[in-house]
């Protein structure tokens, strides 16, 4: 008792064969998803970077400065989520080296000051670029931020 009972292909008369399964460190930890590719280990900023190398023509045409994109200009960018189609609006970040798997939407994206900057929402299938929606920061009439950091998670349109 205590060992898992596994069915074998050559079992006769519906006999069950007991087999011991040993823990394999490489198989277990080697298949675990990671949050980011560790391409910049040891560098001051080891996480994903904004996608400023616009090798993708789609991003090159519609991107703003420093990896910021306007989702409203992506006229053909319809995203599928659990069978429902939707389109993002507003500004966001195009991130490279995210290496996030399906189900990562809603993950927080932090800036170099370890403050929340955006929420991860989607990825392109072709070039491993991820998109994150920027969190709005309230500003005064002169365009100056009222507070250093502010998080407004309510979206309206």
UniProtKB/Swiss-Prot annotation:
SUPFAM superfamilies: Trypsin-like serine proteases. It comes from Mycoplasma pneumoniae (strain ATCC 29342 / M129 / Subtype 1) (Mycoplasmoides pneumoniae). GO terms for molecular function: ATP binding; RNA binding; RNA helicase activity. InterPro entries: Flavi_NS3_S7, Peptidase_S1_PA, Uncharacterised_MG067. Belongs to the MG067/MG068/MG395 family. The lineage of its organism: Bacteria, Bacillati, Mycoplasmatota, Mycoplasmoidales, Mycoplasmoidaceae. This is Uncharacterized protein MPN_589.
């Amino acid at each position: 008792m205590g060992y898992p009972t596994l069915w074998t292909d050559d079992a006769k008369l519906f006999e069950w064969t007991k087999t011991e399964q040993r823990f394999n460190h490489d198989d277990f930890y080697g298949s675990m998803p990671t949050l980011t590719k560790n391409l910049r280990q040891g560098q001051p900023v080891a996480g994903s970077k904004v996608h400023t190398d616009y090798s993708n023509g789609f991003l090159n045409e519609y991107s703003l400065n420093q990896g910021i994109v306007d989702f409203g200009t992506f006229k053909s960018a319809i995203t599928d989520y659990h069978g429902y189609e939707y389109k993002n609006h507003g500004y966001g970040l195009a991130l490279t080296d995210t290496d996030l798997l399906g189900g990562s939407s809603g993950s927080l994206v932090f800036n170099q000051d370890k403050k929340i900057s955006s929420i991860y929402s989607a990825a392109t299938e072709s070039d491993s670029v991820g998109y994150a929606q920027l969190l709005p920061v309230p500003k005064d009439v002169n365009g100056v931020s009222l507070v250093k950091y502010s998080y407004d998670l309510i979206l309206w349109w």
